Amino acid sequence: MEKALILSIFIFSLLLGITSYSIYISFGPLSKTLRDPFEEHEE
């Protein structure tokens, strides 16, 4: 029981960390350096 709880908490925090990092990259200060392929090929 204790092993399963620790594993589930680890997986949950790993997913939460990945989600938080991707949101930070998408909308944070580094988002200014991301290129937009749709804007480049707009006619």
UniProtKB/Swiss-Prot annotation:
A Pfam cross-reference name? PsbN
The membrane topology term of the UniProt record is:
Single-pass membrane protein
Q: Where in the cell is it found?
A: Plastid, Chloroplast thylakoid membrane
Q: Where are the bilayer-spanning segments? A: 5-25
Q: Which InterPro entries match?
A: PSII_PsbN
Q: Which cysteines are joined by disulfide bonds?
A: none
Task: Name the major location.
Answer: plastid
Which GO BP terms, alphabetically? photosynthesis
GO CC term, one of those recorded: chloroplast thylakoid membrane
Keyword set for this entry? Chloroplast, Membrane, Plastid, Thylakoid, Transmembrane, Transmembrane helix
Report the family membership: Belongs to the PsbN family.
User: What role is this protein assigned?
Assistant: May play a role in photosystem I and II biogenesis.
- Protein name in UniProt: Protein PsbN
Q: Native species of this protein? A: Cyanidium caldarium
Its taxonomic placement starts with: Eukaryota, Rhodophyta, Bangiophyceae, Cyanidiales, Cyanidiaceae
